[in-house]
Structure formats: C-alpha cells, structure tokens
C-alpha cells in the first residue's frame, strides 16, 4: 500500500500558478467536477474568505486525491513571503514537491526562498514550467535560470510546441510523441500523435541530451545506446525515478494550467518520479529515556509515531490537528502520548481533508496525513506516539516576528474574548505572537509583515466577530548585550511566617547574531531526599531558575522588548534545605539577570529586511532610489529579458508605505517582496 502513496507539495513564487495547477489536478483526477478559478474567487483550495478576496493562498490547504490506483496527498502552499511558516511546516512533512515556475518570470525571489527551504528538508522535486501561453514565455530560458541560480542539473522530459499565443501542446521526449489537448472538453481529452516533421530535429536533439544525462548513471542505458538499440520507456522512467530520489538531477515538464494544457502528464510524473513514503530517508527521532538518536523506518507494524505539523481552528470541532504519520497506526478513540509535554490525549475522530471539507476515517497509518480531533494540548511541532516507547521527532524552526500592532477591546466585556481569540490564532500560526505590554497594559500582536498582520486582524474582526480597535503597525525590536558580566544575588524574605532564601551567581554573555537565547548550568541536581553537597540544587529549584530566566528573555532588559542572542550561565548556588523555595530562586534569578544585563552594555536591535524589487528596465533607477532613500543597501542585481531584479537590505522601520511609493515612482509596473534577514544594532 505504501508504494501506492505520494505526499507532495506544490511550491512556487506568488502568482506562478500553484493554486490553478492544483485545481486542474483535482479536476482531472475527478476530485472536483467543475474547475474553479482564482480570479473569480472560486478556487477549491483557496477556501478562506480572504483568500478568495485577495486571490492568493494564505494557509496550506491539504487534500487527498487518486490517480491510476495511487493515493496522492497534496498540500498547496502560499507563495507570499509573509506566510513562509506555512511553507516551512508543509515541506517538513512532505516526501516530494512540484516546483511551479512562471515561463516568463523564471526563478523569482520567493522561488529561491522555497527552493532553499526544500533543500534544507532534502525534498526530492520535479519542475513544471507554467504559463507557456503568456507573452514572453521561454521554457529554455527558465531551464538556464534554474541551473545557474541553484547549481542543479536540469533535464527536460518534455519540450513545448510553440510559445505565447502559438503554444499548442508538448512533445514527450520519453515516448517521442506530441500531446495535444481538446479545448472543448476543458483539456479532459488529449491525444498522443506522431511528431510533426518540422519539429522532429529539435525533439531528437533534446531526447539525445536527456538520454546522455540519464546514461551517465545507468550502465544498462549506456549499453543500449552503444548497441544502437531503442531504450524502453519503462527503463527511462525507472532511471529518472532513481535520480530524483538521489536528487542527482531535476526533470522538467511544461504547460499552461489555465489553458488546461500539460496537467495530466504532470500527475503521471508525480506518480512515476516522486518517492513513496517508504522510499525517503527514515525519520530521525530521539529517545529521551535512553538519550539516544535512532532512525524510524516508515512501516505500519511499528510503534505509532506522528508529527503535528499544523493546527486549524474549527468553530464546531475545536482544534483540527494535521498529523503526518511516520510509523505504526492510530485508530479513532485511541489514546496517544504527547512526548514533549509528557501527557496523554484521546483522538476522538480522524478525518481525511479535502480543502475545508472532510470525510471520516477509522484509522491512519505510517506514511499518511490526516486530521485528529479531540487533542487539547498538542501544538505545531509536537510528537505523538506511545508512552511505552516515547520518541521525539525534530520540531520545526520558525522565524521571529518583525512587525507589531496594538489591539484593544472596544468594551470591557470583549477583553476575555479577545485574549481567547489571540490564543487560538497564535496556536494556529507559530509566527504570530501576542503579549501584554508591561508598562501600558496594551495587548501587542506581532507577525511577519503588513499583509500577515492584516490577514490575522481581519480574521479576528470578521471570522471571530471580536470588536476591537487595531493600532498602526510598529517595528518589533529586540534587546541584547555586548559584553560579559557576572553577578551574584541574595534573596531573603519572610512570607506567611516562613523564611524564603536563595543565593546564586549568573554570568551573562553575548552570542553571535541569529543564535537566539540559551540557558546553561554548572550546577548539579539531586533528589530532594539526598544531600546536595556543594553547588547543587534539587531538580524543582533548578527548574525554577530556568523558568525565571526564560521569563526574563521575554520581558527584556531596558525597554521591554524580547531579548535575543544572550547566553545565561548559572555558575554557582548556595542551598539551605530549610529555607530554599522555588519562589525565592525565581525572584533571585530574575533580579540577578536584570542587574547583570543592565551592566553588560545593553543595545537595541532592529530587524533588517531582505528586499527584492522586480522592475521593468526603464524604471529600475527610480526603484533603486526609492530603496536607498530609506537607508537601504543594494547588494546585487539580476537582469532578465525585460525585467531587472534588485536585491537590497533595508531597516524594517523605514519600509512602511514603501509599496505605495514604489508604485507611484514606477507607474505601478514594479513589484517587490520583503522578508526578514537579520537583527542589527539600531542605527
């Protein structure tokens, strides 16, 4: 059964045609009976009201479909840079991906981002060059672009027949046939025909290149070529599949999803070339009991092991937990063990999702993706398994939020509801956070960009019907230190007639930018009943110190912004069994941290953004001056046929309103993407 399953993602730059391609896949595999278009807000995978309004994909919708006895789980991911977290968590659980590229734009900035994310998770992929019917479409230029940008071997298994207005089909280099689609049946009917004489020389040239690439890793094909024999189609497919799994080269297909050309061969390629769940590298897990790493093969007979990769709120069912199963089997009604949180939870129901519709399942097993209902404490990145064999899968890393707005309820009665909704939204989206400002008492929400914040506040106001006022966007700064400092703190207070005492020494030191925070301890732990000896604490007191320091990281040093790139080392403690309490150690640690950091030359860090501007050549000078006026530094430029791409870095604080200014400076012809790059000391 596993070899008949594919878990794939559709990934690309915004507007390359991912959702349209997915719609066509669902239509031709019989999952939907009418093609929905993004432009008229009818796309099946874009089911949120805002997605239909904006014509972009925000959340990664999951759906299951079937093709030639194969089950294909498809995740359609957003291309907009503000929703990178959605792409990240999808790629984490996929076995293969289809990279959709625009035949005109080629490799665009967000293509690079998702490509590198896929590289990080070692996801095998195939490429589909879409929009071959557009003016300026150039399949061969896209091949060159991918090869140069990513340094990968590219190998077309098809070439287009014509381009732009004259695009009419593709030549299949494996079967050496032309494929033409019937427009009257919305491309459902298509036929293979002999290659026209005027196109034969080009087809033979590219087939020879394809066989050269394949034969470099296949003695069998080399032998057949040397003997002048025909190379069977099945052997070619087998060798391509092997190479895709090893990521030796990337097969390229082409078409126009909107014009219903080229989609069925793409689905064939998913089945023929992308891996089954048991063909990718086994999942790496950690056994916290034995403190050892191990590989978990994907098989239904093993102990149950799954990863929660997404949480979605449903007003009737509560939390929908999207789970990828790596081993074993979980049935409806089973108890599962959340390894990280060390808690048991019951799976009330299991669902197979189709965008925002669902069907009930009795069980889910290794390799599959499903939705669990009934889990109360599980969050994105949590591992579910069995208590007898606790294993932890590697969690997911998400970027830090860089932009904030204040929200306040319109009435006191809305206050609790607002907090409840913010908790739901931050559980759904790990790059969205909310906190209370310690000085003003205001609620501050933070996200990845203006669009991200706009989408979330609209969900809060429209979907959850919360009555609240939303402030103007502000930059989310960070605090850090620049020198090392050691500090000792004694705490002594009588509370309720009982002495509370603690004494500890902390060293704080700066870390490299981008390292995050960490807490380390030289202090040993012992059981309460044992004797501590020197420089040792009971486990609950050491936990209290750690908890206190983590709280300090969130609340900042001078201004109240979260800290970053600080290491705190617990150097030594004094322990008196009669007066030591968790409260005393928490208070001592917090005061010690504040004093040490205040003396360690604290600094304010601001987020710096990577900005990519796509501009027609005649406006590129105006576009560049817009970014330099904002204190931006131009790092490099790429030139394409009629477009230049400017790569720059600029402080987030100066980028508000950039979209409007860029549009007016370039008569609305330039566009840009912006993503977080790094924090640096505020200029």
Curated annotation (Swiss-Prot):
Quick one: which gene encodes this?
A: fusA1
List the PROSITE patterns hit by this protein, alphabetically: G_TR_1, G_TR_2
HAMAP family the UniProt entry points to: EF_G_EF_2_B
> What does the entry list under GO cellular component?
cytoplasm
Keywords from the UniProt entry:
Cytoplasm, Elongation factor, GTP-binding, Nucleotide-binding, Protein biosynthesis
Q: Which organism is this entry from? A: Treponema denticola (strain ATCC 35405 / DSM 14222 / CIP 103919 / JCM 8153 / KCTC 15104)
Q: What does this protein do?
A: Catalyzes the GTP-dependent ribosomal translocation step during translation elongation. During this step, the ribosome changes from the pre-translocational (PRE) to the post-translocational (POST) state as the newly formed A-site-bound peptidyl-tRNA and P-site-bound deacylated tRNA move to the P and E sites, respectively. Catalyzes the coordinated movement of the two tRNA molecules, the mRNA and conformational changes in the ribosome.
Question: What is its subcellular localisation?
Answer: Cytoplasm
GO BP of this protein: ribosome disassembly
Molecular function terms, GO-annotated: GTP binding; GTPase activity; translation elongation factor activity
The reply to whether GTP-binding figures as a keyword in the UniProt entry is yes
Which residues does GTP bind? Answer: 12-19, 76-80, 130-133
The record's listing under InterPro entries reads: EFG_II, EFG_III, EFG_III/V, EFG_V, EFG_V-like, EFTu-like_2, G_TR_CS, P-loop_NTPase
What name does UniProt use for this protein?
Answer: Elongation factor G 1
Family, per entry? Belongs to the TRAFAC class translation factor GTPase superfamily. Classic translation factor GTPase family. EF-G/EF-2 subfamily.
So which domain of life are we looking at? Answer: Bacteria
List, for all copies, the residue spans of the domain called tr-type G: 3-278
Gene3D superfamilies noted in UniProt: 3.30.230.10, 3.30.70.240, Elongation Factor G (Translational Gtpase), domain 3, P-loop containing nucleotide triphosphate hydrolases, Translation factors
